[in-house]
Amino acid sequence: MELVNICKEAGVPDGVVSLLSGDPAEISNELMESDIIKKVSVTGSTRVGKIILKKAADKVQRVTMELSGHSPFIVCEDVDMNKVADIAITGKFRNNGQVCISPNRFYIQENRKDEFVNAFMERAKKLKIGNGMDEGVDLGPLTTAKRLEEIEKLVDTTKKEGAKVLMGGQRPSGFNKGYYYEPTVFDDVKDNFTIMKEEPFGPLVPILTFKTFDEVIERANDNDLGLCSYLYTNSMDKAHIGSEKLESGCVAVNTGVVAIAEAPFGGIKQTGYGREGGSGAIKDYLNVKYTHMGLKI
């Protein structure tokens, strides 16, 4: 909403940028059924994206889809664990984990796992929960009551499947209102657990270990979603091989920054298709026309 206000203040003519707020299903139906709309870009869950894609098929409507992500966060043995923990904290708990590119599946090389977990939890325990508009607050609430309910359900499921809660796993004390949930770290997680298949979209951190680089790449790719991958290593060979073999639209190597305006951003698999950002993004909004013209006849 603020962005639309800025456009207006900057002198963008009325009608160039419009904002609709209301029932998402009703608004999307209206847009998809309109003959005026020539292109639709969707940011949302894979479930919702599939619904809109079916509607688009009736009109052969052009769409760009940036859907769910379930990003792996791979930490090799040759890195500074304190530096990686700093990146992990910022990336994981930005907007309390409610970001499509949030790292969700943490794979740590087994001989450095304890070091990473200790460094990560030391930082996570210092995060202040509260009103996001207040000074010094690091973690605000989840977006809705439904999101809080789904997080609690996933935590219960993860524990029942055999995971151990190292920290968190509950609503914070002293918060009688709002959809707050503590940063939660799990140990003893296996690849077939629900949390490794479904995007948590919240402050949940499952920790797993790996022995070899080839093994962890294969395990990281064992998912229907492919938005972003994070890889931390001081080996340029592993950095290049990992960036090529990881099945995602974006790869961040030794950094937590992956989405920038000048670069193409988007996913593969059931995360969708099309790109936002970069010079290539505008192509989805243009028609390609070929004309073959003789000089005279």
Q: Model-derived features: where do they sit?
A:
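PLP-dependent aminotransferase-like
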Residues: 1-28
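Short alpha-helical
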Residues: 25-27, 47-48, 58, 237-238, ...
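Conserved residues at the C-terminal ends of beta-strands
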Residues: 20-23, 43, 91, 254, ...
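Short hydrophobic/charged patches on amphipathic alpha-helices used for structural packing
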Residues: 28-29, 85, 214-217
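ALDH superfamily catalytic-core signature
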Residues: 39, 47-190, 253
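Conserved C-terminal structural/oligomerization subdomain of aldehyde/semialdehyde dehydrogenase
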Residues: 37, 74, 160, 173, ...
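Short helix-initiation/N-cap motifs at beta->coil->alpha
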Residues: 24-27, 69, 211-213
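A charged, well-structured terminal subsegment
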Residues: 21-53
